C-alpha cells in the first residue's frame, strides 16, 4: 500500500490534494493545511567532544584483492531504537537535540484537533506520539519543519492506514513524501525490510542528485548539502514487520567564503575557510580533520578519493568519498545502490559541499552488520566496495543496470559488458563475405568503384549488428558474461599475485569464515569459444559473444582496476581488425569510455602524432549517425594524417571523442577525462601498477583539432602534474608561454600553401601575380585565411567566410582586407563603402537582398554555401569551408559549356574541401590542382619541430629558451622559429618540384602524384625504420641525424646531449623519414630496383665527408 504526497512550496496557504493508492486504485482525500517559511537551522544543543583523534586502521589499497562480484547480500533486519545516537559519545557530527520538541509536539496535537479535524480526537495523541517517538526520525527533521508540515505528514500516514483498511490491503504501509523549494527540501520514504523491490529511496536520491547536486559546477556559487538518516522500525502498531525509514534534508549552502567565479589553480585548501557554516557548527573536530585529509587529496588529483575509517572504542565504519563538484553526475544514488547490493544501509549519510569545488560524501555503517566478522574480512569487503566506488565514478550507470539490480551480475561485470558492447558496436566485422567478394572484383583505383564500395559499406554497417541487437544479445547471456569477466579479471586485475584463487565479496553469514575462497579456472580462447558455441542459440549471437574473447585476447593493458581513474581506457593490439574493412594495419588502438563520452586513439606507427577531435551532435539522429561512423572516421583521419606526415618523424595518428547524447554541454569535462585515462596507460603508477602485456613504454604526441584548440594548455599542465616525463612534448598547439609555436601567429601552414601557389607561377613564368584574379574561402578571421591575405598579392575578387560573401569584380580593397586580417575579423566588418558599384556583400542573416545585377538573394546562408561555385578567377585557394564542398555532384558547375574551367590554378589549403573524384574532373578540364595533404603540411612540420625541441631540452632549459615570459620572446625561440619557417619552405619546394617533374615527364595527374609520393615515402620509411643494418652504422646514423636536426637546436644543446635525451624510437623515426622522403622526392616514379642502393651509397659518402 503506497501513499504519496508532494507539497510544492512552504510559503503558500492552500488546499492540497492527497492521493492514496491502494491496490492500484486512486482515492482522493482532502487535507487542509497552511505552510509558513521555516528557518534553515537554529541553535544546536551539543554533546561534549571526546578528545580522541580518529585512526585509519584499514587503508583501502592494502587489502587483498577480492572476487569482483557477489551472489549473496547482507540484510539489515534488526530494529534500531529511535534516536540511538543522542546519548552516545560521537566522532562524526554533533547530534541535534531539539529543545523545543515537546512544545512543538503539543502544538501539532492542537493543530490536528482544532484546525484539521481529519483524525478522530481520541486517536490524535496516539498518532502524534508514534510519529514523534517510534519512527526513529532525527531531531533535525522536527527542528527544520513547521507545525503545519508535520501535521500534514501525520495525516498522510493516518490516511494511508484508513485507505489500507478500507481496501483490505495486505501489503505493508509505505510512505513517500517530498517537500521541495529553492532553499530547502525534505523527503520521507519507507519500505519493508524484507521487500527491497518496494524500496524507492534510489528514486529519491536520483531526484536529489538531479535537482540539487548535479547542475552545479566547480565554480558555481550555489551548492546544496544533504543529510540523510535511516532507521528501522514499525510504521504502525499493526505492521507485521519492520520498515526502513529514510529521511533526507537538503539545504542551500551558506559558505564562510564565497566561491571564486574563475577556476583558479590556486584554490584555498583550509577547510575552515571554504566550508558551509552549518557544517562547521555541526561537525566534530575528528570529522573536520578527516575531511581536511580527503580534501587535500582531492585537490591534488583529478579523480575520486575514497577513504575508510573506523574508531577505537566504538565499532563504527565510515566510508568517505571526495571528488570535484561537477566532474560526475548521479554519483550519490549510484553509490547507495552499490551499498544495497552488498546489503549495507548507511544509518547517517552526509553530502558536504565546499566553496573550493570539493564535494565529500560520508557514509556511516553500524556494528550490527559486522558483529561476527573478523577485522580482515571487513577490510576485504570495504576494499572491494572502494574499488567499485571508483568504477562507478567512471560510469554511474550503464545499459546493463537491470542485470546488476537483479543481482545476476556485479557492478564490475555490467561495466565490463558495457565496455565490450561499445567495442563490438565499433570494430566487429559487419560486412560479411559477400562484401569481401565484391571488393575483390571491383577496381579500387577507379573512383566510381571506390565510392560504390564505400556506400555499400556504410549501409551494411548500419543494418547488420546494430547497437540494440548487440545489447539484447549480451542481455541474454549473463552467465557467459560472468565467465568471460573472470578471465578478464585473471589477466588484468592489479595485485592478485597471478593466482586464480580470489576471495568472494563476503556476505553476513560468511564474514567470519576466513577460509572462504573462490577459485577461477583459467580458460584458453579456444575453450571459451567452445563454451560460447554451446551456449548461444544462433550464429549471430555467437558473433557478438565472440567479441568478448577478442576483447580479452588482444587487450594489452587497462586502468579498469585502478582506483584513481576518471574514465576507463584500454590499449589493444589491433591485429584483430578485419583486413577487408581496414586494409592498412594499425600499430596501436586505445579505447576510452567515460560517463560523458566514448572515444578512440589510433596510430599507424609507434612514433606518431595527430590532433584530438571532439565531435558534437545537434540532435539524437545526428548522434546516432556520428556514433555509427566514429571508428571509421578515426581510422580514415589517422590514415590521412599518415600521408600528410611524410616529411616528419611522427607517423599518422588521430584521436576522436564523441560526446554522449545528453552531454553536449560538457566538452571540456569529456576531453579532460579522455586525456587523463590515456595518461593512465602511459605512466607508471607505483602504488597500483597496471598489468602490462605490451612490455615497453609508449609516448603519444597529440595536437589540437576540432573543438579542442582551447584545451591543449590544460592537457600539458595536467601531464606535468601527473609527473609524466614527456609532458613538454605531449601536446602541440599550446600557447607560447608554455613553449608552443602558434601556427596562426607565424603563418606556418600558409607558408607551405604559398610555396605551391608561387611555385606554379614560377613554372609558368608569371612574374606579376597582382594581375591575377583570386577567390578565397576561409576569411580574414581564420589562421589560413588571414595569413594567405597577408602573404599574397593577387587581386582578390571574392572572399567567402562564416559570416557571408564579399565580392567585387573590380577587386576588393587590399588595405581593408589587410586590416581585417590583422584584426582577425570576418568580412561582415568590411567597409562596404569601399566596394565598386558592381560589388556586394551578402551576409548569412540576409534575406531577399537585391544584388547590383538585379538578382534577388532569398536566403543568405544558402547563397554563402554555394558561392564558391559562382565565380571565375585565375586562382582559387580554399582556406576554409565545409568538407566535400566541391564534389562529383556539383563540380560540373565550375566548367562552362565549352569545357573551360572557372579557375586555372587551385591549391587546396583547407582539408578535404574537394573530393578526389571532383579533383580528377577539374584536372581533366585543365586545372592545375594541388591537393590538401601536400599544400597545407607546413602546420604539421612546425608542430613536429616543436615536439623535437620539447624532447631535446631538460625542463629548466626548456622554460628558459622555449617559453615566452611577460611578452618577451627568448632569443633562441625567435631564431628557432625562423629556422622552422625555412624548413617548411624547403620541404614544400622539394615536394612541389617532384610533383611538377612527375607530371611533366609522365603526364600523371598532380593529385595522383601527391598520393603516390605520400604512399611511397610511408612505405619506404617503414622499411628503413625496421632495417637494423642501416641503423647499426653509427657513423652514418649520426651523419643523417646531424643533417636532419635543426642547426639552431644542435648549436644550443649539442648533438651528443640530444641523442641522450631523445628516445631512440624517435631518433630512428627522424633517421628513416629523412632518407625515405629525399629518395622518393628525387626519384618520383622510378622503377629501377637498384636506385635506392645507389642513393644510400651516395648519401653515405656525402654525409660522412661533410
From Swiss-Prot:
One of its GO terms (cellular component) is mitochondrion. Pfam families: ELFV_dehydrog, GDH2_N, GDH_2nd. Gene3D superfamilies: NAD(P)-binding Rossmann-like Domain. Keywords: Cytoplasm, NAD, Oxidoreductase. InterPro entries: Aminoacid_DH-like_N_sf, Glu/Leu/Phe/Val/Trp_DH_C, NAD(P)-bd_dom_sf, NAD-GDH_2nd, NAD-GDH_euk, NAD-GDH_N. The keyword Oxidoreductase applies. Signal peptide: none annotated. Its main location: cytoplasm. Its EC number is 1.4.1.2. GO terms for biological process: glutamate catabolic process. SMART domains: ELFV_dehydrog. It is an enzyme of class 1 (oxidoreductase). It catalyses: L-glutamate + NAD(+) + H2O = 2-oxoglutarate + NH4(+) + NADH + H(+). Belongs to the Glu/Leu/Phe/Val dehydrogenases family. NAD(+)-dependent glutamate dehydrogenase which degrades glutamate to ammonia and alpha-ketoglutarate. Homotetramer. This is Probable NAD-specific glutamate dehydrogenase. It comes from Schizosaccharomyces pombe (strain 972 / ATCC 24843) (Fission yeast). The lineage of its organism: Eukaryota, Fungi, Dikarya, Ascomycota, Taphrinomycotina. The gene is gdh2.
